[in-house]
């Protein structure tokens, strides 16, 4: 039996071996930290026995899939603790998620925050008991009878939805048994560090028509230090929550009259418009033309594009003159209609069309989250139509543009290349060409990337950009997606140099993604303290008293007439109070004016970056701030010991 490992090396065994035994054979150290295995792409338990040639990857907590097994086990430990403490609890589902895990439960008396400590204490006992975790199966009818006897109606419903000939997978640890496909750890012992973080409501199976359950969230790590680092990040994230800062800084609001539909307030619109102006500026330089397509288009178009069949549940539809229409959830079909509005030649290609299009998608109410998950947003789409020979260079151009944008905001990022999934459309030749073009572009640019085998869209491979914010969280924003299918569906053509008709290749790409979501990310990344060029208010003029109001107004007028976004604080408050409030509003510069300033024609400058910056003439201050704004530089805040 030949086992091929991730690094390309191989091992030969005369008899069948479990994943954990192979891990031990490789290294005792690896076996100690292993959480699961991946056999020919399928994630399995460490106890799984291998009896034929295969490719094997030993997963640890450092692998996303290995992390999932670790945290899924933690969710079972939590459910076991809840059942020990509150036996009347009915269990629903408990998966691992990106930053931890949750379990949905149902009980007459909901849990309160104080209960979480009791549950954690019981979880520690379960970990200390070092309970072996075992997997076994049962026929569907027996599984239903088992959970009916246990009075677990949600488990019964899940099993009843499966085909009659299904064999049902169970996992048990001590007295606790759960319906689960796995994988899980070998025992409860490795789960050394965990924290139950919050309680929330969640509809059963995500439908508002079903009962509201209680969701218990938590996270876990192999080491206490890793948990503490994560919890510190979460505390920092709370302070930076864009919903909280958005309200405090007067940027946007959400109302129950429009759930998932954000209202941008004047300062928020200033911020949004700065981003849109910047987008237009860099795209014009990069050779894009801007278009705008209708917000509502006919059913026929969405049937041709495939959205009506595959995405209709997320679309808002209406009837006009007895014909079905849909508000667009994506900009691509409209862009295609623009492409086919006139004959195209190879001389017209590549054709780069950008659109800041307003799209609407029906997200479930439980998934809405400030600006991060909304039902209406502006997508910074661009669609590039090109010949096969142009694909590689166009991808490189998009990557460079994305790098320019993310670098401006101080984001680090990593890149993932997703290849052909099993369920895909198009020829092997098309897929090989497209994947090699993406891979080659990244290699040409010397950009490190991770390959996600089989994770591309059904219509083409893609590159995803995951940016890292100032507190270490990652956000997937930029995407470059190759598409063979829409040009085929819409029968797009161009006339080649040979005079014959050819099918163009299409790239879908976004940089910000959703402008609204990107604003939410920026609010949290900068903690509301935006670079001067982006700040809704760049300067606050602070007269020491009413006596200097005329001079303060003159300063304000000069600032505004010079294109600097400035406001004045005319309240009869002490200057210290005005300064503190301007600082709370994260305003980059405060200009204090009093007798000396008026007499000498100066302004006293206080900045968010260095505090007291002394006095300057207004002309000199204007020259400096305009240079900072034009260059889009981001001044760093000096630490106390640097001042």
Task: Tell me the role of every PLM-derived stretch.
Residues 1-92, 97-643:
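NTP/phosphate- and nucleic-acid-binding module
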């Amino acid at each position: 039996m030949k086992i091929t490992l991730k690094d390309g090396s191989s091992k030969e065994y005369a008899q069948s071996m479990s994943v954990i035994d192979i891990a031990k054979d490789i290294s005792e150290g690896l076996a100690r930290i292993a959480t699961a295995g991946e056999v020919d792409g399928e994630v399995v338990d460490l106890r799984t026995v291998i009896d034929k040639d295969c490719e094997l990857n030993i997963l640890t907590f450092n692998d996303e899939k290995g992390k999932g097994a670790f945290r899924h086990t933690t969710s079972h430990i939590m459910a076991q603790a809840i059942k020990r403490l509150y036996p009347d609890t009915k269990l629903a589902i408990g998966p691992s998620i990106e930053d931890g895990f949750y379990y949905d439960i149902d009980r007459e008396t909901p849990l309160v925050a104080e209960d979480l400590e009791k549950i954690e204490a019981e979880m520690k006992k379960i970990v200390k008991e070092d309970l072996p975790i075992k997997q076994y199966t049962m026929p569907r009818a027996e599984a239903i009878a088992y959970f009916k006897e246990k009075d677990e109606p949600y488990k019964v419903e899940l099993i009843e939805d499966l085909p009659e000939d299904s064999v049902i997978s169970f996992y048990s640890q001590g007295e606790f048994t759960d319906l689960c496909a796995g994988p899980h750890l070998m025992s409860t012992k490795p789960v050394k560090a965990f924290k139950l973080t919050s309680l929330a409501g969640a509809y059963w199976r995500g439908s508002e028509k079903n009962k509201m359950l209680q969701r218990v969230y938590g996270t876990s790590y192999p080491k206490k230090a890793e948990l503490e680092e994560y919890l510190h990040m979460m505390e920092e994230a709370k302070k930076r929550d864009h919903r909280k800062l958005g309200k405090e800084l007067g940027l946007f609001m959400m109302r129950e009259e429009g759930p998932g539909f954000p209202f941008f307030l004047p300062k928020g619109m200033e911020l949004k418009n700065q981003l849109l102006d910047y987008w237009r500026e860099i795209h014009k330089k990069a050779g894009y033309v801007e278009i705008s397509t209708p917000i509502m288009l006919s059913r026929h178009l969405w049937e041709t594009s495939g959205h009506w069949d595959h995405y209709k549940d997320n679309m808002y539809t209406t009837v006009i003159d007895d014909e079905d229409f849909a508000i667009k959830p994506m900009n691509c079909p409209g862009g295609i209609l623009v492409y086919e509005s006139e004959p195209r030649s190879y001389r017209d290609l590549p054709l780069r069309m950008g659109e800041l299009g307003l799209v609407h998608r029906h997200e479930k109410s439980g998934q809405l989250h400030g600006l991060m998950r909304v039902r209406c947003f502006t997508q910074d789409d661009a669609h590039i139509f090109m010949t096969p020979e142009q694909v590689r260079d166009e991808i490189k151009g998009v990557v460079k543009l994305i790098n320019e944008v993310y670098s401006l905001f101080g984001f680090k990022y990593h890149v993932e290349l997703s290849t052909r999934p099993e369920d895909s459309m198009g020829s092997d030749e098309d897929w090989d060409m497209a994947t090699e073009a993406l891979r080659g572009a990244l290699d040409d640019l010397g950009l490190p990337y991770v390959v996600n085998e089989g994770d591309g869209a059904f219509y083409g491979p893609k590159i995803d950009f995951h940016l890292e914010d100032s507190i270490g969280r990652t956000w997937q924003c930029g995407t470059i997606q190759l598409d063979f299918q829409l040009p085929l569906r819409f029968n797009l053509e161009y006339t080649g140099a040979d005079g014959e008709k050819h099918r163009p290749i299409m790239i879908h790409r976004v940089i910000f993604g959703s402008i609204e979501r990107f604003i939410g990310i920026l609010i949290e990344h900068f903690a509301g303290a935006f670079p001067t060029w982006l700040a809704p208010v760049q300067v606050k003029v602070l007269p020491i008293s009413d006596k200097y109001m005329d001079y303060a107004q003159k300063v304000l007028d000069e600032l505004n007439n010079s294109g600097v976004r400035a406001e004045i604080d005319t309240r009869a408050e002490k200057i210290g109070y005005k300064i503190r409030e301007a600082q709370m509003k994260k305003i980059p510069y405060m200009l204090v004016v009093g007798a000396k300033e008026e007499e000498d024609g100066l302004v006293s400058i206080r900045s968010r970056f260095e505090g007291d910056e002394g006095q300057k003439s207004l002309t000199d201050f204007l020259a400096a701030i305009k240079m900072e704004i034009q260059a889009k530089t981001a001044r760093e805040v000096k630490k106390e010991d640097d001042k």
